[in-house]
C-alpha cells in the first residue's frame, strides 16, 4: 500500500494507492499544514496507531469527520461541563486543598479569562453558578470560529 498526500486549497488531502481516503461519505482525511500531514502519513504507515483515538491520526480522523451538527454538540458539551468544572469548583472545607488549588489553578483561570474575554468565577454554591449566560455566549462565539482540528484538540483536552 502506498500512502501519499497532496496540497489542496487550505488543507492537505490523503491518498491510498492514488485513491482519496475518506473518513465518512463526504469527508476526506485532512491535515491543516505540512507538518501535520507528515505526522498523519507516518501514522498511516504504522498499523498499531490506527486504533488509538488520541494519536495524531485518530484525532485527525475525528476532526475531519465533523459536520456542523457534531460541532454544535461538542460546543454544547464544553459549555455544559463549564457549570461543574473541577478547576472552578471550590465548595468544600479542606483548607489545605483550597490553598493548593488557589495557588496552582488561579493563574490558569486568570489567563483563560483574559484570553477569552470572560469572567469565570469559582463555584461555591450548588444552587447558584455565577458563570453566566453572557460569558458562555462569548466563549461559544470564540469556539465557533475554531477550525475542526483546533476544536477537536480543545474538546479532547478538556475531557481528560
Where on the chain are the PLM-derived regions?
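Glycine-rich loop/turn
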Residues: 1-29, 35-47
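Short secondary-structure junctions and interdomain/linker hinges
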Residues: 47-51, 85, 115, 119, ...
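Internal, conserved structured core segments that host functional sites
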Residues: 73-135
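Predominant activation on well-ordered alpha-helical scaffold segments within soluble catalytic domains
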Residues: 38, 106-109, 160
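Generic, well-ordered alpha-helical segments
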Residues: 29-32, 54, 70, 100
Amino acid at each position: 500500500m502506498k500512502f501519499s498526500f497532496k496540497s489542496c486549497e487550505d488543507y492537505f488531502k490523503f491518498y491510498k494507492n492514488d485513491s482519496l481516503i475518506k473518513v465518512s461519505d463526504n469527508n476526506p482525511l485532512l491535515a491543516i499544514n505540512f507538518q501535520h500531514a507528515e505526522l498523519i502519513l507516518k501514522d498511516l504507515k504504522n498499523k498499531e496507531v490506527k486504533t488509538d483515538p488520541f494519536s495524531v491520526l485518530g484525532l485527525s480522523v475525528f476532526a475531519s469527520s465533523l459536520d456542523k451538527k457534531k460541532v454544535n454538540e461538542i460546543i454544547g458539551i464544553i459549555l455544559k461541563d463549564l457549570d461543574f468544572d473541577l478547576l472552578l469548583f471550590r465548595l468544600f472545607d479542606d483548607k489545605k486543598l483550597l490553598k493548593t488549588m488557589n495557588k496552582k489553578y488561579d493563574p490558569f483561570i486568570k489567563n483563560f479569562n483574559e484570553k477569552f474575554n470572560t469572567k469565570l468565577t469559582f463555584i461555591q454554591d450548588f444552587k447558584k453558578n455565577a458563570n453566566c449566560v453572557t460569558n458562555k455566549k462569548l466563549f461559544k462565539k470564540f469556539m465557533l470560529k475554531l477550525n475542526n482540528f483546533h476544536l477537536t484538540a480543545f474538546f479532547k483536552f478538556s475531557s481528560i
